[in-house]
Amino acid sequence: MRNTNPCQFFFLQMNRLYPFFIIGCLLSCNNIEPAKPPEVAVVKIPEKIDGKVAELLQITNKYVTENKGKLNDSVFLLHADLLNKIYEEGDFHPIWSSDEKWNSTADSMYSLVHDAKLYGLFPSDYNFPSLANIFSGMASDSLHKKNAALWARADIMLTDAYLGMAHDLKLGRLVKDSVTIRVDSLVTDSFFVQHFQEALAQKNIRGSLEQLEPKLKGYTDLKAAIPAFLDSAQLKKATYVFYPNKDSASLMKQVAARLSELGMVQAAGDTGLLREGIRKYQKQNNIPVTGRIGEKTVNSLNNSDWQRFKRIAVNLDRYKLLPDTLPHQYIWVNLPGFYLQLWNDDTLALESKIVVGKPLTRTPLLTSKITDMVTYPQWTIPESIILKEVLPGLQKDTDYLKKKGYSLTNDKGDEVFTSSVKWAKYKKGIPYKVIQGSGDDNALGILKFNFNNKYSVYMHDTNQRYYFARSSRALSHGCVRVQQWDKLAHFLISNDSLNAAPNVNTFKTDSLKAFLKRKEKHVIPVRTKVPVFIRYIGCTGINGRVKFYDDIYNEDKMLSERYFSNKPVI
């Protein structure tokens, strides 16, 4: 190496580095960005513009596919692979225009995107701002009509908008959960492509999309109430008030900003005026007038029209998780609405107030079937309640069960004296059952409805019937207390008689009355197993108006933030 002159040394080093140079070049070639479609491609002869649009559609499809759906900084296409398939099958001919003119299907599709909120959808999800710019430009500027790049861009955006709306109207945007029971094995990508092609052939864009919507009464009633809601709604982003908030200055600042948006506070930083604004707001919204910031006031402030619209969107999508048709008989329990409905052949046979679980002991969402009824039931306290309430109570006072009217038994059913147990050693449960005997004071009341579920919950009467007079009834340990339990029981018994085979003896309502009069415990099988749907529907449509329920478990808020938090107001 010492005898090597500088030139020889240079070439030796280059020979060593050359392979790495080649590899680097190859890697950089693989990272070359796809060719971007032109922003402008003017065609002066109208008869030739469709050919240029087809050429640009091929380039645009390739670019979007390789660029993972991104067309430019403001346009993202969610169905790039399907778009390529659709346009490739049509030799990349434009779908929505011809000879510098939109066809009728384009006008219909654009109108649907514009009116997406009427379906509980967000126009921005279907690139409405970019489409609006192109459509308005075409209408006002003849030079725009000669720009084949604009026609190609709009064409692919309209097709993507159809596919997006079709998916969202059919399946919704919520991820399936543990109670989702619809079967969508047939709803594949090819389903939406075929549906799109049929819509074009029949020139019925709106009808084809509306055909995909649920036909369930709850969905159609809520959707029908959206126009009236939008007519009076002020859809604009609002300051969100975080509560509780350890930073009192920050809390006051957020409240002041929100009240200012509502026109109730003008002077920033004036504590006296802010208190007055809070009082004024509380009075207008039927909140106890205190001038102080509390949970009810904050919940109301955060319930802006934009937040309400997002709740509508969430709840419309909840219906899309149900089967296309419901059974001809079923029990529908809506937790935030605090009601139970019994439907029989599309007729509301019974509606009852209910009491549901507290936020800390929520009633679970589930689907099941009524299996039997029990008169004068005893209550075996669930493990969850033992851990949260009973065990801490016993560790403080061994007479806790006696005061509650409960008894303690071992696995053989023998009663155990609470004073004989060292409760301090138990942390995660106890090897005993805690039971409340049957009777008028039993928490289950005098009748219980059983249905199979993994949560050990059921529906029942209650010894606290005064709860039904309250407007907010999230008060139980998780089971559903039914005010009209007697009417529900009579329906189930009569229903069994109607569906029984000839000459088959069935249970009679007179027998139920006798059991209850004698205060006897009996298990009454239900032969016609009526389905039970326990669901969380935060708003419903009633007589053309949206009725919003208190978001008792914050489920609407959670889903709105998860799926729709960054949606722009359009």
Where are these regions (language model features)?
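N-terminal secretory signal peptides that target proteins for export/translocation
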Residues: 1-14
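Sec-dependent signal peptide recognition
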Residues: 15-22
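C-terminal motif of bacterial Sec signal peptides marking the signal peptidase cleavage site
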Residues: 25-28
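Cationic-aromatic interfacial patches
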Residues: 30-189
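Well-ordered beta-sheet/strand-loop patches within structured domains
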Residues: 30-90, 163, 183, 200-570
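Long, highly charged low-complexity segments enriched in Glu/Asp and Lys/Arg with interspersed Ser/Thr
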Residues: 193-195
